[in-house]
């Protein structure tokens, strides 16, 4: 779930 949040928060990454 943490990874999913990071991707949503950082679409550039």
UniProtKB/Swiss-Prot annotation:
Gene Ontology CC entries for this record: ribonucleoprotein complex; ribosome
Protein name according to UniProt: Small ribosomal subunit protein uS19
Segment forming the signal sequence: none
Domain of life (superkingdom): Bacteria
Keywords for this protein: Ribonucleoprotein, Ribosomal protein, RNA-binding, rRNA-binding
MF terms in GO: rRNA binding
Function description: Protein S19 forms a complex with S13 that binds strongly to the 16S ribosomal RNA.
Family: Belongs to the universal ribosomal protein uS19 family.
